[in-house]
Regions:
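Canonical P-loop GTPase G-domain recognition
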Residues: 3-16, 145-200
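Switch II of P-loop NTPase G domains
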Residues: 18, 54-63, 76-106, 114-128
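Hydrophobic packing within well-folded, soluble alpha/beta domains
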Residues: 39, 108-109, 184
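Conserved nucleotide-binding/hydrolysis micro-motifs of P-loop NTPases
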Residues: 58, 70, 77-80, 115-117, ...
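Glycine-rich, phosphate-binding/catalytic loops in enzymes
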Residues: 45-46, 88-91, 125-128, 154-157, ...
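Conserved C-terminal guanine-recognition region of P-loop GTPase G domains, centered on the G4
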Residues: 96-168
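Conserved G1/Walker A P-loop phosphate-binding module
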Residues: 1-82, 193
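Conserved amphipathic alpha-helical interaction elements at protein-protein interfaces in regulatory
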Residues: 45-49, 101, 131, 164, ...
Length: 200
């Protein structure tokens, strides 16, 4: 797959309304404004498939995209300070319900900003994924903001941070210039292929 046949399906704020899980699902998680929409657009070679929000933390929905023979599942961003406790609880319920349902959870892409150490919310998410044995890789975003001399050291630092939480792989990426996108596409393709093999 090269992720070029991509369509937005719908946004879901209630877990019971999620579409039937009839194919592999690649989900994307991260802090508000970490660059999820930009990364999804770059993976699919589209500019406006996933809309980039100018109001972080306002989207308490799970967005589904039909991409070739799988789903891209954009989970709501977390860590926005101005969100009410009621909204936080609703987001927690939505995400818990998604992962607890018997769906084709093929692989999750956890996004982290490569310029900063993981926040408390990021580490909480890594612990959640590890505890629930959800297979995931980390995509470090905004690699275009680093100097070339910083790339290898940054990746190594994050590998050391994420490895104890069960992370399978760390990939440096940029939604701006496409850095690391082919590598991440290959990781996602391999995960979908393995899922399809098991289903046969």
């Amino acid at each position: 797959m090269i992720f070029n046949k991509a369509d937005f399906i719908a946004s879901y704020g209630i877990s019971s309304l999620l579409p039937e899980s009839d194919r592999p699902e690649l989900s994307f998680s991260g802090r508000s404004n970490v660059g999820k929409s930009s990364l999804i657009n770059k993976l699919c070679s589209r500019k406006n498939l996933a809309r980039v929000s100018s109001t972080p933390g306002k989207t308490a929905t799970i967005n589904f995209y039909s991409v070739d023979d799988c789903y891209f599942v954009d989970l709501p961003g977390y860590g926005y300070a101005k969100v009410s406790n009621a909204d936080r609880e609703r987001w927690d319920d939505l995400i818990n319900s998604y992962f607890e349902a018997p769906r084709h959870h093929t692989l999750l892409v956890q996004l982290l900003d490569c310029r900063h150490a993981p926040s408390a919310d990021d580490l909480q998410m890594l612990r959640y994924l590890h505890y629930h044995r959800i297979p995931y890789v980390v995509a470090l975003t905004k690699a275009d903001k680093l100097k070339k001399s910083q790339l290898a050291k940054t990746q190594e630092d994050f590998e050391n941070i994420c490895r104890p939480y069960g992370c399978q792989k760390v990939v440096l990426t940029s939604g701006e210039n496409g850095y690391g996108i082919p590598e991440l596409q290959a990781v996602l393709n391999a995960a979908v292929a393995a899922e399809n093999e098991e289903a046969e």
